[in-house]
Amino acid sequence: MVQALVFAVGIVGNILSFLVILAPVPTFYRVYKKKSTESFQSVPYAVALLSAMLWLYYALLTSDLLLLSINSIGCLVESLYLTVYLLYAPRQAMAFTLKLVCAMNLALFAAVVAALQLLVKATDRRVTLAGGIGASFALAVFVAPLTIIRQVIRTKSVEFMPFWLSFFLTLSAVVWFFYGLLMKDFFVATPNVLGLLFGLAQMVLYVVYKNPKKNSAVSEAAAAQQVEVKDQQQLQMQLQASPAVAPLDVDADADADLEAAAPATPQRPADDDAIDHRSVVVDIPPPPQPPPALPAVEVA
């Protein structure tokens, strides 16, 4: 009866852990569509990969089939996440992630396994140490998403804090706590107590900052002011580009009306636009000749 209950709880734990593993899928689909990692961080996924690797090693030592199956899937999926992240991360973030993976997921994991296999001869002692190390990094998995709390508080937005990851981590922590309790495996039960607390803290943070309209009133006001300034600039540009716009002046308008009503004279054309400013050759007729002089008359 107890074994059946343990197996049932373990199955539920595997299902919830699988949902935890799949929770970042929308995040990486967004990364793929936008071809950019934006402000997402790789630390939670690198830590999750290391935790899955350590629990996989622990499951091999204890011959725990349920832990073995779910952590094998976890290693595969977390590796795919990091691969997608590296493909679309900017140069600086990509370099940091590569260093992190090489130092933590390769060098550190290899050092732990080599030390336990070569230096610890007793199997029970090896299992105890492997369980303690796995429990420590399980806590790191729960804490890792909290690295973006500062960003959430500063921006007053939970856009880059996956809600479903925190939600399923909380449920998974509850189930795995009872699994470890029933199995009397305190390396499994203990970290999930703090995991539950960290998960609840993340969900509370999500509730507080989930309303972007309420929490970004200042940002929206600033954006509205920028739009207003932009509209004014566009209006000013349109006025400057208009060919016949003048300041509003009553006297000037009246003078313009009088000038428009005045008849056209040679000295002043009716419309300045009608003036042809090109050179004009005018033929001036010669002046009239004076009448011929009368012959002189002699007087007798």
Curated annotation (Swiss-Prot):
It comes from Oryza sativa subsp. japonica (Rice). Disulfide bonds: none annotated. One of its GO terms (cellular component) is membrane. Belongs to the SWEET sugar transporter family. The gene is SWEET12. It holds the Pfam family MtN3_slv. GO terms for molecular function: sugar transmembrane transporter activity. Residues 8-92, 131-213 form the MtN3/slv domain. Residues 256-300 are annotated as: Disordered. The chain crosses the membrane at residues 5-25, 39-61, 68-88, 100-120, 129-149, 163-183, 186-206. Residues 26-38, 89-99, 150-162, 207-300 are cytoplasmic. The keyword Repeat applies. Induction: By the X.oryzae pv. oryzae (Xoo) transcription activator-like effector (TALe) proteins (artificial TAL effectors). Forms homooligomers and/or heterooligomers. Residues 1-4, 62-67, 121-128, 184-185 are extracellular. It is found in: Cell membrane. Mediates both low-affinity uptake and efflux of sugar across the plasma membrane. It comes from the Eukaryota. It is a multi-pass membrane protein. Residues 284-294 have a biased composition (Pro residues). The keyword Repeat applies. This is Bidirectional sugar transporter SWEET12. Keywords: Cell membrane, Membrane, Repeat, Sugar transport, Transmembrane, Transmembrane helix, Transport.
